[in-house]
Amino acid sequence: MRDRISAFLEEKQGLSVNSKQSYKYDLEQFLDMVGERISETSLKIYQAQLANLKISAQKRKISACNQFLYFLYQKGEVDSFYRLELAKQAEKKTEKPEILYLDSFWQESDHPEGRLLALLILEMGLLPSEILAIKVADINLDFQVLRISKASQQRIVTIPTALLSELEPLMGQTYLFERGGKPYSRQWAFRQLESFVKEKGFPSLSAQVLREQFILRQIENKVDLYEIAKKLGLKTVLTLEKYR
């Protein structure tokens, strides 16, 4: 089973060396505990062993293991899609949301539209409704800016450099996400996003949680709350105070 770790990591081409080492360490530790035969019982034993770790460490390990378990299921190595869950008592202890380990979002996907939706929310804090309304005319790749129009208001947000290559192939369209020159519906967007996050081993992630991840990353980078509010199109910082 250990050789499957190498195969799993080989499919994660976008990961840094440090990220791969972290995955490898967590997965080897996981297999040391569950053994060669993965079952509901062995997974419960492993979860019990995690109980004394910090919440952030538990979430990291569970995330890595769930992605690995999904990989094994896809390859036919296990007969069921097993999944670890954070213990209820651990969830209650969490006072503030944690930054999730989402490097895998930058890797290739069978759901490219869902992937781009997720990245736009995660990296820019945009709402799905805002994303669906984006016209390519609102995008200036040379200056790395995007104009967001909402009701009677407009705001200009910076496009992260990493997203430029993702947007460039779509610049010949009318809308960023379209069919026959018309934008897709919110239901379509949520289905695409749902399929993508499930593929990456995060089936419970929603657009709201991804937007929260954007906020947490901004705060970790010491961005002022007023600047974050401006990026999100918020009139006040009241809803951001809880993240201090």
From Swiss-Prot:
Q: Which ranges carry the Core-binding (CB) domain?
A: 1-73
Domain named Tyr recombinase is located at 90-244
The Gene Ontology biological process annotation of the record reads:
DNA transposition
Which N-terminal stretch is annotated as signal sequence? none
Give the matching Gene3D superfamilies. Answer: 1.10.150.130, Intergrase catalytic core (1.10.443.10)
Record keywords: Cytoplasm, DNA integration, DNA recombination, DNA-binding
Major subcellular site: cytoplasm
The record's subcellular location field reads: Cytoplasm
Q: Active site: which residues?
A: 150, 211, 243
- The domain of life is Bacteria
Single GO molecular-function term?
DNA binding
Instruction: Choose one Gene Ontology CC annotation of this protein and give it.
Output: cytoplasm
**What family is reported?**
Belongs to the 'phage' integrase family. XerD-like subfamily.
Q: What does this protein do?
A: Putative tyrosine recombinase. Not involved in the cutting and rejoining of the recombining DNA molecules on dif(SL) site.
Which HAMAP family would you find in this protein's record?
Recomb_XerD_like (MF_01817)
What is this protein's record name? Answer: Tyrosine recombinase XerD-like
Could you tell me which species this protein originates from?
Streptococcus pneumoniae (strain CGSP14)
